[in-house]
Amino acid sequence: MKKKIKIFIDGACLGNPGPGGYGVIICGKKLYKEISNGYYLTTNNRMEIMAAIIALESLHDMYNIIINTDSKYLKNGITKWIKVWKNNKWKTNNNKSVKNIDLWIKLEYLSKKHFINWNWIKGHTNNIKHDRCDFLAKISAKNPNAIDKIYQKIKNF
């Protein structure tokens, strides 16, 4: 039987695009971990997806996971839209290129290693763990130390 854990994630951006960050909390029976990082130039949606990627990359075993996010973009993207995008050769229903393809591909790959229930929660409603993720994401955005290379390449193209 797979171990059960809960993951709380949030992304933030000071301006969109602008400096951004993510916050992650992973908690289980004998596990509690906080992860955060900030980027010089990125978008809020990229930070939301990145938070999920970083959370899943940090796991070394297979888990039964509940991922809590306040991003409908992330939840709908990974649970509904990605199937349509892939069938449309990474185009939206409006025939536009899907944004953040690099992150969606990585997230889908990592998601297949676990059983994940993607849970949308309303942000800023006194959920202690989610509020902590929000705090970590904002602090990281204010103190960036990393470059979102793919985003900057697209931005400078």
Curated annotation (Swiss-Prot):
Mg(2+) 1 binds at D10, E48, D70. It is found in: Cytoplasm. GO terms for cellular component: cytoplasm. The keyword Hydrolase applies. It catalyses: Endonucleolytic cleavage to 5'-phosphomonoester. Its EC number is 3.1.26.4. Mg(2+) 2 binds at D10, D134. Its main location: cytoplasm. Its cofactor is Mg(2+). InterPro entries: RNase_H, RNaseH-like_sf, RNaseH_domain, RNaseH_sf, RNaseHI. GO terms for molecular function: magnesium ion binding; nucleic acid binding; RNA-DNA hybrid ribonuclease activity. Pfam families: RNase_H. Binds 1 Mg(2+) ion per subunit. May bind a second metal ion at a regulatory site, or after substrate binding. Residues 1-142 form the RNase H type-1 domain. PROSITE patterns: RNASE_H_1. Keywords: Cytoplasm, Endonuclease, Hydrolase, Magnesium, Metal-binding, Nuclease. The keyword Metal-binding applies. GO terms for biological process: DNA replication, removal of RNA primer. It comes from the Bacteria. Endonuclease that specifically degrades the RNA of RNA-DNA hybrids. Belongs to the RNase H family. Monomer. This is Ribonuclease H. It comes from Wigglesworthia glossinidia brevipalpis.
